[in-house]
C-alpha cells in the first residue's frame, strides 16, 4: 500500500478542522480566519503560498488552481517536477500574478546541474521541494547546485524533519536525519544569496529550526504538514519556541519587524480544496500566540512578495 504525504496530511488536517464546540475564551480556526477577510469574502491582501505542489496526474490542475487562486487571492510558488517544467513555465507566463514557477530536482541525479540551468533559462524563480536525498543536505557533493542558486539569488525550499513512509513491503533509502533543519545552517552561511526555506519547521525539531532562523537573515520556515494539526490544542507553545520578539538582534528581518514570528512564511502542502483550511490553522496559531497584525501580513504573503519582487 502506498499513500502520498499530501494525501495523508490532507486527511489529518481535515479531521482536525471538523466543527467543534469552542471552549470559553478559545477562538476556532474558522473564526480566526474569518476575521481577516474583506467584504468580498476573500482574504484581506494577497496570500503567497510557498508550498503548492503541481499535480502531474491532474490534466486540469492549472485550471483548478486558478479557480482557487481567484477565490483566495492566492499566489502560488508552484513546486514542479522537472518533467512538467515547460507546462508550468508556460502557465506562469500567462498568469504571472498567480503562478511563480519553482522546480523540483533530485540532488543526487548525475545531470542535476544541467537541470537547474535549464530551469533558470525557462524563468524559474527557485527550487523546491528538495527531499529524499541520499546524503545530508550540507554534503559538499550538493554544493554545485547551491552555487548556481546563490548566483541566481534564488529561494530554495527544503523538506525538513520527519517524512512519511510510502512503501512498507520493500527497502527504501530514505532517512529523515539527512533532512534535519540543522543542515540548513551551513547552506545559509556558505551561500548568503540563497534564501533558505525549510518546509514543516523541522517537525519535530522546532527549536533547532527557530534558532537557526533567528541568527540567519536568509533563513525562514513554513508550518505546513502535520504540526498545526497535532499542536491544535497547544498552539501557544509556538510562543515559547519563537521567543525573542522585541529582543535586540544582529540579523536583519523583513521590514525591520521585531516579532520572532516574522521568520515564518505561509505554506499549505495540501490539496487545492484544503488550502483555505490551512490558512485557518495559521490564523488560529496567530490568535493563540498574539502575533501582531503587521507580522501576520508578512507571514501570509508580505515576506515572500518582497523577496520575489511581486507587485502589490
PLM features: residue spans?
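A cross-domain feature marking catalytic cores of carbohydrate-active enzymes
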Residues: 50-54, 80-82, 103-107, 128-132, ...
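Active-site gating loops and adjacent loop-to-helix segments of metal-dependent hydrolytic enzymes
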Residues: 38-44, 71, 96-98, 163-170, ...
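Catalytic pocket-lining loop regions of alpha/beta-barrel enzymes
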Residues: 28-31, 37, 126, 139-265
Amino acid at each position: 500500500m502506498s499513500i502520498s504525504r499530501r494525501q495523508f496530511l490532507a486527511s489529518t488536517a481535515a479531521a482536525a478542522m471538523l466543527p467543534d464546540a469552542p471552549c470559553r475564551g478559545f477562538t476556532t480556526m474558522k473564526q480566526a480566519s474569518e476575521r481577516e477577510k474583506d467584504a468580498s469574502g476573500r482574504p484581506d491582501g494577497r496570500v503567497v503560498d510557498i508550498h503548492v505542489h503541481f499535480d502531474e496526474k491532474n490534466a486540469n490542475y492549472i485550471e483548478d488552481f486558478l479557480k482557487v487562486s481567484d477565490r483566495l487571492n492566492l499566489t502560488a510558488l508552484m513546486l514542479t517536477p522537472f518533467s512538467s517544467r515547460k507546462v508550468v513555465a508556460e502557465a506562469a507566463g500567462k498568469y504571472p500574478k498567480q503562478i511563480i514557477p519553482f522546480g523540483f530536482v533530485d540532488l543526487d541525479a548525475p545531470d542535476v546541474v544541467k537541470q537547474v540551468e535549464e530551469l533558470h533559462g525557462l524563468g524559474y524563480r527557485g527550487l523546491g521541494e528538495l527531499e529524499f536525498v541520499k546524503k545530508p543536505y550540507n554534503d559538499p557533493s550538493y554544493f554545485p547546485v547551491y552555487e548556481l542558486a546563490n548566483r541566481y539569488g534564488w529561494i530554495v525550499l527544503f523538506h525538513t524533519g520527519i517524512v512519511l513512509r510510502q512503501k512498507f513491503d520493500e527497502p527504501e533509502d530514505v532517512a529523515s536525519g539527512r533532512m534535519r533543519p540543522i543542515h540548513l545552517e551551513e547552506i545559509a552561511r556558505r551561500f548568503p544569496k540563497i534564501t533558505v526555506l525549510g518546509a514543516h519547521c523541522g517537525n519535530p525539531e522546532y527549536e533547532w529550526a527557530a534558532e537557526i532562523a533567528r541568527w540567519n537573515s536568509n533563513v525562514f520556515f513554513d508550518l505546513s504538514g502535520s504540526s498545526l494539526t497535532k499542536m491544535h490544542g497547544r498552539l501557544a507553545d509556538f510562543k515559547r519556541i519563537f521567543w525573542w520578539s522585541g529582543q535586540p538582534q544582529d540579523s536583519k528581518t523583513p521590514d525591520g519587524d521585531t516579532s520572532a514570528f516574522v521568520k515564518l512564511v505561509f505554506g499549505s502542502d495540501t490539496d487545492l480544496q484544503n488550502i483555505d483550511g490551512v490558512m485557518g490553522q495559521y490564523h488560529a496559531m496567530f490568535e493563540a500566540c498574539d502575533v501582531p497584525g503587521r507580522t501576520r501580513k508578512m507571514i501570509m504573503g508580505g515576506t515572500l512578495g518582497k523577496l520575489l519582487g511581486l507587485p502589490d
